[in-house]
Amino acid sequence: TDADILTILKTDLMVSSSALDTYLQTLIASAKDYISTEGITLADSQSDGMLVEMYAAYLYRRRREENVQMPRMLRWALNNRLFSEKGAVNG
């Protein structure tokens, strides 16, 4: 659920206050949108929840720091998720 993703995201970003919750929830929604533009249909699974969390954390860090590139781990996870989905549809 989005609440679970928010909890994990806050832990990842070392945010303990609820002051940023609305902003972080917006990043979670944006991450889902960006992932869907990659051609991925998200499921209600733990692995897809972690994919959304990783993407939301990347969006947060990108806004806070200069020259933040998409982490290779995230790009790898997106590619693997897309290929597994397309393989299941076409296979």
At which residue positions do the language-model features occur?
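Conserved short "hinge" loops at termini or chain/domain junctions
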Residues: 1-51, 61-65, 81-91
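Contiguous, low-complexity intrinsically disordered segments that are highly enriched
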Residues: 67-77
